[in-house]
Structure formats: structure tokens, C-alpha cells
Amino acid sequence: MLFRSDLDLEPALTTYYQKHLTDGTFVSWLAVDGERIIGTSGMSFVEKPPYYSNPTGKIGLLSSMYTHPDYRRQGIARKLLDCVVEEARACGCGAVWITASEMGVLLYTAYGFEKNGRFLQYVL
């Protein structure tokens, strides 16, 4: 089983976001149309030992990427990705990683992400 539909993640997610948005280890963006949220993106920061293609060892893990169906194919996801990449660079990350849905793979590869094992990777 890939997921449990009976599991209530809201309390754990609330705790996670309160902690990590406050301490700066998670950042998030919203795309809005008036007062309506039409897109989201988030990124966690992790550190691995430095290596040749990423001498800082810092990686941005992209998550929570979503665009409302009524607003797709209007460049919103690309603008959110621009925010992610800009923030990752500013924080000294050497790469941004994501595990993507089939629909998302097209967006990410068009943006410049490349397959790296189980992840798609954008080298900064």
C-alpha cells in the first residue's frame, strides 16, 4: 500500500510547518488571483556531505508544487519554480531535487531538471 487514507496528517503537518517555516528550513510560495490561492510551492533544505558537483552539500527539496486546474498552462508553475531556484541559490544550495508526478516531469524537464536516480535534479 502506498498510502493510508485513514491517517489524519493534519496535526503532524501543522507541527512541521510551524517549526520549519519559523526556523527557515522550509520556505513556501503562494500564487494568488485576488484572494484565491491558485498555486503553491515549497522547499525544504537538507545538507549532505559536500561532493564534487555540490561543494556546499546543501540541497533544496521541492515539494507541495500545485497549480489549480483552471490556471494550468499559464506560466504559474514556471514562476513558482523561478522563486524556488532563486531562493535555493541565495541559500547556497548546489541543487534542487524533486520526485515528480508524470504530469510534473514535463514541466521540470522543460525547465532544465534532469533525471538523477529516483529524483529529478536541477544543478545550480
Residue ranges and their predicted role:
Residues D6-L30, G42, P49:
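Active-site rim helix/loop that mediates acceptor-substrate recognition in acyltransferases
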Residues V96-L106, Q121-L124:
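Conserved beta-strand-loop-alpha-helix junction that forms the acyl-donor binding cleft
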